[in-house]
Each structure stands twice: as C-alpha cells, then as structure tokens.
Amino acid sequence: MKVSLQQRVLFSGLLICAPTHSAELSGFAGLGASVRPIYSGSNHMAVEPLLNAGVNLHSENWGLFGLSTDGLIWGLTPDSPFSVSLLLTQDEARKEVFNYSFSGKKNRDLQGMGDLSAALMAGTDLRYQQEHWMLWLRLLTATEKQRYGGDAPGRSLIVTSGAETELWRWQSVALSVGGDISWANSGYQQRHYGVTAQQAQRTDFAVYSPSSGFQQGGLYAEVVWHLDKNLAAGLTSRAQYLFDEAGSSPLVNSRMQYTLSSLIQYTF
C-alpha cells in the first residue's frame, strides 16, 4: 500500500508536536514476495514483491504515532489491553491492464473498465489484546467521492472485524491463526465490483450495481520465526470467500481467493 507525500508531511507535523524528551523512536524494514489474485475476484494469480517499512514514535503524553507503507496510525492508548487508534491509509488502485512484475505478460480481463485510482481512507481501529489472543474492529471511509466509469458513487465505507490467537510456540517459532469478516456499503461495492453503463458499452460485462452487504470472510495462518532480537521471518497463507453482492459481480471469476506471502523483517 503506497504512502503519499501528504501523509508524510502530516506525520512530520505530529512529530514536532510530540514531547521528544519522553519519546522513543523505533523502525522496521522488510522485504518479501506474495502470490495472490491480480484483483479481487480474479482467478489469475501473480507473484509480486513485498516491501514493508516504517517508523514509530512512542510518547508518554501523545500515545503511539506510526508511519509505514500501510499508512498513518495514531494509537491513543497503546499500553493498555484495550486500544483505540486513528488511521489514514489507502484503498489500493487497480489497472484495467495488469502487468506481471517478473515477466512481460499482461492480463486484459478488465480492459475497457478504466483504471481505478487509489482512494484515501480514514477511520478507527479498536482492539482488545491479551498475551495469546486478540479481537479487533476496524472502520474505514473514503475522505472524498471519486468518479469511476462515468459515475460518482457515494463514499466508500468498509467495516472489518476479526480475531487472532497463538496456537503454538516453541523457542523462537510461533504459529498463529485468525479470521475476519467485512461489511461494505454500496459505494465500496460499486468501486470494486460494479459495472456502469459506460463501462458496459466498452466491455462484454453487463451493467451491475451492487448494494451494501457482507463483502468477504477469510481465514489465515501465520508462522513467525525470530532469528534474533531484531530479525524475524514470516510465512502467511490466507483463504477468503466473496459473499453476496461482491461474489455475484460479472467481474468475479472466482469467489474463493487465496494468498501466500513471505517476509523477512528487521526492527531497529
């Protein structure tokens, strides 16, 4: 997920406001690869590079500020089991012609739909965390309306809740499993799964206007191996199912979506 210059400037302003005499600065950087569908609902998979990096500022008076490749986070109560965070992130862009990273191949399944630009999303994250498990709820909404396919649907809104637990740990290796489910409004569904009249004229897809409803449910498993106190390697597998309106879209070739990703991360 890309981070815009606007987000970096905002984070810099927060750093200036934080009392540096009581703050701790840390960071992380990771590199890996993932195998995943080329877009939500596609039955074609692609190998893509993964880059994960960021910095965190932990202040006694202001909480936790984080800037990463996932966006911005302000954790208001980072040291308690129940935490509340404010988020600024992106709903990823989608190209009508997909270029495979490690070959000259192209996928033209969505040609004629037009490129879907990234959307800035703001929201909040609530979670309750104990030593070996956690529950969480996240709400994100687009900061502005966005035209796509000749129409301007309402602002995207998506609510996701989930749970995760650590099943097994041996020395420096841990196995965790989790699940989540998402509900999305019609604006989000139209953005990702809808087909406007203008798009239908340029493609073989029928006009489709999905309504609000459950968007997806997923299960995942993750193995993390701490090589030393600063270096860790992880492997994550995920399976998710597109529900109702999302899964019925003419853009969707497969309701079941699978992802496998690996990452080596260094913290400092």
Which residues make up each language-model segment?
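Transmembrane beta-strands of outer-membrane beta-barrel proteins
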Residues: 28-34, 65-68, 85-89, 136-140, ...
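Transmembrane beta-strands of outer-membrane beta-barrel pores
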Residues: 33-39, 57-59, 88-94, 130-132, ...
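Predominantly the C-terminal beta-signal and adjacent terminal strand-loop region
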Residues: 41, 214, 219-268
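Short glycine/proline- and aromatic-enriched beta-strand/turn motifs that initiate or cap beta-hairpins
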Residues: 23-67, 72, 94
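Residues on the lipid-exposed face of transmembrane beta-strands in outer-membrane beta-barrel proteins
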Residues: 31-35, 51-57, 71-76, 122-130, ...
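Residues that define the transmembrane beta-barrel architecture of outer-membrane proteins
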Residues: 25, 45-51, 116-122, 131, ...
